[in-house]
Amino acid sequence: MKDPHSPSVDTLMAHFGEDRTMYDGAVVPPVFQNSLFTFKDWDDIDAAFEDRTRRPIYTRLINPTTRIAEQKIAALATASRTDLEARLTASGMAAVSAVILHSICAGDHVVAVKNVYGPTNNFLNSYLREKMGVETT
C-alpha cells in the first residue's frame, strides 16, 4: 500500500531538479531568457569556466531553466538510473548533429535511411564528407 504521506510521482516531477534555496525561495523557478550571466570576480569566472560550479556562463552551454527541464526529463525517462542525463537543444538539427558528432571519428562511415531529413542529408553528405572525410551510404 502506498504511504499516504509520500508525494506522488506527479508531485515529484513537478518539483524535481528545483532547488528552493536558490532564486530567493521562489515557489516556481524563474524563466531565464538572458544569454549571458555575470560574475562577482575573476575567481568566480575561473571556477565557472573550469566547470567546478555548474554556474551558467552562456545560455547555449548552461541555462538554469533548461537545466531543470533536462533533469525532469531524465528522471522521467530513466526511472531508477541516476547515471543518465537529458540534453535539450535549440533545434532538431542541433540534436542530430550533436549525436552524430559524438558518435563518429574522421574517416568513419555512416549508414542512413534513404529518405533521411534533408538538412541531415546535407550535413552528412556535404559538411562531414568535406570536413572529416566521413562517407555516407
Regions found by a protein language model. Give the residues of each.
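Glycine- and other small-residue-rich loops at beta-strand/loop junctions that grip anionic moieties
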Residues: 34, 88-89, 113-114, 137
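A glycine-rich helix N-cap at a beta->alpha junction
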Residues: 126-137
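Conserved N-terminal alpha-helix of the aminotransferase class I/II PLP-enzyme fold
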Residues: 36, 41-94, 119-127
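Conserved PLP-anchoring active-site segment centered on the Schiff-base-forming lysine
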Residues: 102-120
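Glycine-rich helix-loop-beta junction characteristic of Rossmann-like nucleotide cofactor-binding loops
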Residues: 76-78, 101-104
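N-terminal glycine-rich, Lys/His-bearing helix-loop that initiates the first secondary-structure elements
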Residues: 1-56
